[in-house]
Amino acid sequence: MRVAVAQFATSSNTQENLATCIRMIKNAIECEPLIIVLPEYCNTQAEHKNHQQAWDEALDLNGEFLEQIAIQAKLHKCYIMLNVTLRRDLIRDEQNPLIKSNVSITTCIFSPAGELIHQADKQTLQACESEFFICSEKTTDSVSTPLGKLGILAGTETLSNKNTRDLAIHGAQLICNAQSSQSHAQNSLYASAWACDNNVFIATANKISHCEFVKSNKAMNSNGSSQIVSLNGSVLATLANDKEGIIFADIDIEKAGLLKHQRPDGTNFIDQYRPELYQQLALLPKSAHTAALKSKLPETANVVLFATYKSNEQAIEDVCYYIENNLSDIIQLPELFFISDKSITNNAQQLIEIETLCSALIKQISTVLRPFQYVCTSLVINGAHQAVLISENGIFATQQQLHFCKRYQWTALGNNLKIIVLPLEQGSINIAMLTADDASMPELIDVAALNKVNVILMPFDIQTSSEVNFSLLSRAAEHKICIVASSREKSFLDEQSSNDISKVKPGNMKKIKPQKSTGLVVDIVNANISISLDKLKVKQQHGKITKALVHPSETFKSF
């Protein structure tokens, strides 16, 4: 099916805005879409001087503005989604412009029959919006149509994966997102991450600022960047942030949705998802613990990603040699770092031999570690796959794998995320460890952030390039949390190329070069600002040894 997105400016003149909407709908119809997505605040602008202005510029649900949009939907036989401000009372009794009216920011969907089939009030209001607008009871229901199931978001609701996830859990396959946003992260990072995490397409229609408004308030000029994002996070179509226009893309909505979401090893999402695990409440007392944590948080910690190319005993010796000749606080190794072919773990006899080797390597590595120095990896202990932290005294902490995956279907699963206080030479930090597919569940990072984790250590085996290109970056940005993740190097087809693989002629297949992907270190350098991709300090794992600094003290500012 074809999806079209319109990007344009609005003014404070409602009739002018209606004319603009109709003009852009007619422009979009030229590409023959089945659904057209329009931006946020189609009838007005986001800023208001007082409550009287907010009321005057808001629409009646049965008024001319929406009636004309309904006519366009019926005339062109397509779905039209737009976001407007709606009056929720018949009249405004108050004469005082400083007294608030019942006005909502509402997204409406009109069917090809010209009927209003869905309306949803914006739930995540910014401070300036809360002053003028209300929101009704939240709904996370997807909208069932002959095309597929649609999910509706507006504005800053896309800054959290939770909103997209809630819609996806309720069956959404295409997220229609109306924006009037300045956030670069929403367009450059979050949309791609949320699409990958939830196996949904995301069509975002953003605003450009009206010329008169730009002159009066240049700082509020919207970033625009309307776009359509595919299931793998690749951008199918985008529009420059200062241009009025239409973009469109053809999507296969039958492939979308969490019910059809699979990991590369064939593990189904529904076999991994564990809602009971994400209900874990904050484990630590807030006020007293926070004060104590702040007083002893180290400013920095030295970390290294170490990915040996060797196997078995030689791999262990390789790690020990590095430890003896370096002073890193935390040496992060990949998942089961000494095994190149993880499939051998599915052989019962070999699994016993692997566990024996794991016991030996704990002793061997601990003998060369200095005080306040640690190695993080994953091992097989007591028949279970688990992340481990090794100190000079042996095992310091363990974290059993929490989510099922076919790669390690033999392992028992843990039932809670452990929050570990890790002593370093300059103080202590809170850490959590994630291995296998655990980090693919954003809810688990929510639990870590709720419990004031400064650094997440990840011994993992990368399965898709989107994990490091989008997902892990978005986790760090959303929660302002440092991530240290190490994997053996893998090669994947470029996301855009793989998205269009059916269009590639057989003779040109060799021209599509696989892209190498590994782990990374994501550092938070200034938690006082709104974090976007360009505000994260990211160091990609390169070669055998990748050294980096992380700043746990900056993560505290977000608690």
Report the location of each language-model feature.
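CN hydrolase (nitrilase-like) catalytic-core segments centered on the catalytic cysteine
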Residues: 58-82, 159-247, 354-374, 440-538
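Active-site mouth loops of central-metabolism enzymes
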Residues: 9-16, 152-158, 307-314, 435-436
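Cys-nucleophile CN-hydrolase/nitrilase-fold catalytic domain and related Cys-dependent amidase chemistry
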Residues: 14, 22-113, 117-122, 181-198, ...
